[in-house]
Amino acid sequence: MESPKNSLIPSFLYSSSSSPRSFLLDQVLNSNSNAAFEKSPSPAPRSSPTSMISRKNFLIASPTEPGKGIEMYSPAFYAACTFGGILSCGLTHMTVTPLDLVKCNMQIDPAKYKSISSGFGILLKEQGVKGFFRGWVPTLLGYSAQGACKFGFYEYFKKTYSDLAGPEYTAKYKTLIYLAGSASAEIIADIALCPFEAVKVRVQTQPGFARGMSDGFPKFIKSEGYGGLYKGLAPLWGRQIPYTMMKFASFETIVEMIYKYAIPNPKSECSKGLQLGVSFAGGYVAGVFCAIVSHPADNLVSFLNNAKGATVGDAVKKIGMVGLFTRGLPLRIVMIGTLTGAQWGLYDAFKVFVGLPTTGGVAPAPAIAATEAKA
């Protein structure tokens, strides 16, 4: 049984491979053991395997998924989560570029783009099929960078805050751990996303502005300056931080409830296919909540990045408070629900591919230790 104190030891002390320090320790311990054996006139008492292991290395091994070599909460674990985030966010956002394009234009020019169907019709008539994928390069690059930071730092902050809180408080306030970890990760992720988002919106809502990222980026800088790339950072935080807090906390809670009430077997006994299905379902429901919570700020981001010198006050005056909450919302619910479900499905599929467990359905590490200690 694992001691609850083990989870409070910093993650850098977990080891599965020999570091220079552990190698030196092994050499010292081995030399001492050999010297004692040579001085002994008779064979030493037979040691148990456990005692031999404890003499060889006193560092605590981090848990691993059977059959694979990636330790939980090791640098390789965070690298895998980071790469999974790149795949899940970059590819999914690029795929829904046509929906995003119509949504942005409905927010900017509702008199022209009155509905989803008419919006697609207008784009097809004016720009052709190619017009549906205008801005896909900044979308792919921006959301790949955001996904890397979002998922990688979420796993890091979730573990860090769990360690700081300790087993008892982590078990009691795990939702707060999810909220704090996701908010911290999104602050960093949006700094990476913001320049790409600014260019993307300008390219998508002003067809004559630029063809894409290669010519749009220098044109934007020439027009707005480098500071203009981060003009929408505060509204972007206002959109993405509540979105991500809802995305991760609700997903973790929904998945836990699915395994608790809808599936008769524990998660550990479910097939990987079923676990990935749960990830998609939990992600889709979480995405609906995300869209509702973050939609007013999404309207602000689109408005500010579309017009030079525009302010939040201008946006509120032109769109109105009701419009901030409702303009383009049905399309965004469909888009974000599908997007979030696909993101969690892809992210967990990659984790399974590299031998890691899927996300959710279990408590954070210190909380698990506390449960085991009470058993």
From Swiss-Prot:
Keywords: Membrane, Mitochondrion, Mitochondrion inner membrane, Repeat, Transit peptide, Transmembrane, Transmembrane helix, Transport. It comes from the Eukaryota. InterPro entries: Mitochondrial_sb/sol_carrier (IPR018108), Mt_carrier_dom_sf (IPR023395), SLC25A3/Pic2/Mir1-like (IPR044677). Expressed in stems, leaves and flowers. Strong expression in vascular tissues. Induction: By salt stress. It is a multi-pass membrane protein. GO terms for cellular component: mitochondrial inner membrane; mitochondrion; plant-type cell wall; plant-type vacuole. Residues 155-175, 252-272, 354-375 are mitochondrial intermembrane. It is found in: Mitochondrion inner membrane. Solcar repeats lie at residues 76-160, 173-257, 274-353. GO terms for biological process: mitochondrial phosphate ion transmembrane transport; response to salt stress. SUPFAM superfamilies: Mitochondrial carrier. Disulfide bonds: none annotated. The keyword Electron transport does not apply. The chain crosses the membrane at residues 76-96, 135-154, 176-196, 232-251, 273-293, 333-353. Residues 97-134, 197-231, 294-332 are mitochondrial matrix. The keyword Protease does not apply. One of its GO terms (molecular function) is phosphate transmembrane transporter activity. Its main location: mitochondrion. Belongs to the mitochondrial carrier (TC 2.A.29) family. Transport of phosphate groups from the cytosol to the mitochondrial matrix. Mediates salt stress tolerance through an ATP-dependent pathway and via modulation of the gibberellin metabolism. Plants overexpressing MPT3/PHT3;1 display increased sensitivity to salt stress. This is Mitochondrial phosphate carrier protein 3, mitochondrial.
